[in-house]
UniProtKB/Swiss-Prot annotation:
Family annotation (InterPro entries): DNA_clamp_sf, Pr_cel_nuc_antig, Pr_cel_nuc_antig_C, Pr_cel_nuc_antig_CS, Pr_cel_nuc_antig_N
Protein name: DNA polymerase sliding clamp
Complex and partners: Homotrimer. The subunits circularize to form a toroid; DNA passes through its center. Replication factor C (RFC) is required to load the toroid on the DNA.
GO BP: leading strand elongation; regulation of DNA replication
Keyword DNA-binding set for record: yes
Primary role: Sliding clamp subunit that acts as a moving platform for DNA processing. Responsible for tethering the catalytic subunit of DNA polymerase and other proteins to DNA during high-speed replication.
Length: 250
């Protein structure tokens, strides 16, 4: 069986963040909570989410895989209000996931499930030379600046600085977060440099990765030369991890 009750607002954030990259996902349910990982259709990005049982008000889950149409789930969750309780209930016989919004009014939906098994996708255990923790709002603003110039972006670590750089045929954009200078906004919360590095990425993917973040969310970004960038952040106890392959420049 599977039945869980949680805050609609928090669950919506997790689903929105995940569905920005993938349309289908397999919820791996057990007594400890929900885990899921999926690749985007182009196999450029991997998304992983983990919702431990502690983030739910009530939780019961046996070991099983639940194939979810994320686009359908996202549309239904969008109808929920932040003050409503959200109840997820698996109907094994009908192969459906029942979704209930509960306040002084009760609204019920159900979605058909895919017949899938666990993909066994895991976030690879990569040792990164560098990492930064940065407020999502500051990172997103730098992406918006870069978008004016090109559809690719370079992330650099060098000389105690985190640099977000984009160059077109005629124009360029550069945002520098200097760890040696005190920042009143505390945009750069943590900086760990092992070696100078630079990697280039598809800007559209990075925008999708961060589309559902709040300005004050803290992004943990792991970097190395020509390595996938790993971005982690939390939503009210749930953990989201994104991995994006670099663009190898000739």
């Amino acid at each position: 069986m599977f039945r869980a009750t949680c805050n609609t607002r928090d669950f919506k954030k997790v689903i929105n963040a995940t569905s920005n990259l993938v349309d289908e996902i397999c919820f791996e349910v057990d007594e400890n909570g929900i885990k899921a990982s999926a690749m985007d259709p182009s196999h450029v990005a991997l998304v992983s989410m983990e919702m431990p049982k502690d983030v739910f008000e009530e939780y019961e889950g046996d070991i099983q895989d639940i194939g979810i149409d994320l686009e359908a789930l996202k549309k239904i969750i969008a109808r929920g209000r932040g003050d409503e309780k959200l109840i997820l209930d698996l109907d094994v016989e009908k192969n459906k996931l029942n979704i209930t919004f509960k306040s002084n009014v009760t609204r019920k939906f159900s979605i058909a499930l895919y017949d899938v098994s666990s993909s066994n996708l895991k976030v690879p255990d990569i040792e990164y030379p560098n990492s930064v923790s940065i407020k999502a709002g500051a990172f997103v603003e730098a992406l918006k600046d870069a978008e004016l110039v090109n559809d690719h972006i370079t992330l650099k670590i060098d000389e105690n600085k985190f640099v977000i750089y984009s160059k077109g045929d005629l124009n360029q954009s550069e945002t520098v977060f200097d760890n040696s200078i005190d920042d009143d906004d505390n945009a750069l919360a943590d900086f760990n440099m092992g070696e100078a590095s630079r990697s280039t990425f598809n800007l559209a993917y990075l925008k999708d990765l961060t589309k559902s973040t709040a300005a004050e969310d803290l992004l943990k970004i792991y970097l190395g030369s020509d390595m996938p960038v790993k971005i982690e952040y939390e939503v009210s106890g749930s953990k989201l991890v994104f991995l994006l392959a670099p663009r190898i420049e000739s």
